[in-house]
């Protein structure tokens, strides 16, 4: 934005009755902040995308025919997503005194098969191809809008947001999931240790040493921390009962090791194609962007900038993130960010009420899906300030 336009707008917003010196100071600080913000964020994001190993097409144009029929799963997912957005929106407005949230993403209730959906779909694609993907929630300083009268269709208002949130939902209780997975890992390690001792402290150990010395060495040197690294091909022994017993134990060991290899962390899942669309919006509005994943008991957040830095370092792949073609996400290539490296910004969520709903399609087909109401999120204001507002 030209400095003259910024000065003109800032002069109009200067405190009434301020003396000339105070007014000039206020204006200079405002313009300086605007220039610094313009330089520091959107340019950094664009540079990170250019360095990204996935060849992101920042000029991508979205096209395609609109779907013609809705499905129960889609309607349930949409209801859950809308509920998650409300949890975040209300938790910020209920627990933050200096900042407030405004719903900004598309909130249309229309779905495939409804009258006018084709026009809606075309307009949505046009929006993606011009301004990019709208975040779901914008966060503003209360001091910038004391009456909270933000006009989300006013670009100057949108550019005053301090944070943009893309809200995702997950059908898990992360506490329960984490406990289950930790116990599964512990059981698998204990089983590996028991098999190791059973082999080494019996005649089967000498038999393995003679038959497959490299496997014997792997097992002998293994610890609880290194069982996951063991990799061997199961022998096809069957000539004696001892060899069959040894083969059975080795098979059980491989199965336990396979359990240790399973991905056991939940994730935040930005789609690969969304990177370009999120960037397009950032380049227009220059607002810090975050992904926030809502589970049914907690919510976690990570910045878009951290995601880009993470995937640009191949040492992080397999531990902190993975790249998968997700059949649950319309078969699109998805970045799965380990939620353990994200910040727990909502430390508790009360469960919502849920009930069945029905949608009748034109030809008389009935779709049954789940709706969600109520529940409450409890914002961790320290993390919100440190890892979101001041990040």
Predicted segments, located by residue:
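Conserved catalytic cores of phosphodiester-cleaving nucleases, focusing on short active-site segments
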Residues: 88, 92, 135-265
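Interdomain/boundary linker segments immediately adjacent to catalytic/signaling cores
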Residues: 2-133
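Structural alpha-beta junctions
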Residues: 93-102, 192-194, 283-289
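Catalytic micro-motifs at enzyme active sites that drive phosphoryl/nucleotidyl and oxygen chemistry
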Residues: 122-128, 148-155, 278-281
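Short, solvent-exposed loop/turn segments at secondary-structure junctions
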Residues: 109, 170-172, 296-299
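Non-catalytic C-terminal interaction segments of nucleic acid-processing enzymes
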Residues: 3-60, 72, 206, 213-391
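A structural signal for short, well-ordered beta-strand segments and their strand-loop junctions
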Residues: 101-103, 164-166, 289-294
């Amino acid at each position: 934005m030209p400095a003259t336009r910024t000065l003109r707008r800032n002069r109009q917003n200067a405190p009434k009755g301020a003396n000339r010196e105070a007014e000039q100071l206020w204006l200079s600080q405002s313009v300086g902040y605007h220039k610094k913000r313009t330089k520091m964020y959107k340019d950094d994001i664009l540079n990170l995308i250019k360095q990204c190993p996935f060849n992101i097409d920042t000029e991508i144009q979205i096209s395609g025919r609109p779907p013609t029929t809705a499905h129960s799963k889609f309607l349930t997912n949409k209801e859950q997503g809308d509920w998650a957005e409300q949890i975040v929106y209300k938790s910020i407005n209920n627990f933050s005194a200096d900042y407030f949230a405004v719903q900004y993403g598309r909130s249309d209730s229309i779905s495939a098969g409804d009258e006018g959906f084709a026009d809606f779909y075309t307009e949505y694609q046009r929006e993606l191809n011009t301004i990019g993907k709208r975040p779901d929630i914008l966060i503003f300083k209360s001091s910038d809008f004391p009456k909270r009268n933000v006009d989300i269709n006013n670009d100057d208002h949108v550019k005053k947001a301090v944070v943009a949130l893309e809200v995702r939902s997950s059908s898990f209780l992360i506490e329960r999931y984490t406990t289950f997975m930790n116990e599964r890992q512990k059981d698998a390690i204990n089983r590996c240790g028991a098999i190791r001792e059973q082999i080494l402290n019996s005649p089967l150990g000498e038999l393995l040493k003679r038959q497959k010395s490299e496997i014997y060495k792997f097992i002998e040197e293994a610890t609880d921390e290194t069982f996951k690294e063991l990799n061997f091909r199961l022998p096809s022994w069957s000539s004696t009962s001892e060899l069959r017993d040894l083969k059975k134990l080795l098979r059980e060991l491989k199965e336990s090791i396979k359990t240790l290899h399973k991905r056991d962390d939940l994730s935040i899942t930005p789609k690969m194609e969304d990177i370009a669309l999120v960037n397009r919006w950032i380049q227009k509005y220059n607002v810090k962007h975050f992904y926030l994943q809502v589970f049914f008991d907690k919510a976690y957040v990570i910045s878009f900038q951290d995601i880009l830095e993470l995937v640009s370092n191949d040492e992080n792949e397999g531990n902190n993130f993975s790249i998968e073609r997700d059949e649950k996400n319309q078969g699109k290539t998805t970045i799965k960010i380990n939620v353990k490296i994200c910040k727990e910004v909502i430390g508790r969520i009360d469960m919502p009420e849920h009930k069945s709903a029905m949608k009748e399609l034109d030809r008389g087909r009935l779709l049954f899906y789940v709706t969600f109401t109520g529940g409450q999120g409890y914002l961790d204001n320290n993390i919100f300030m440190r890892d979101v507002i001041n990040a």
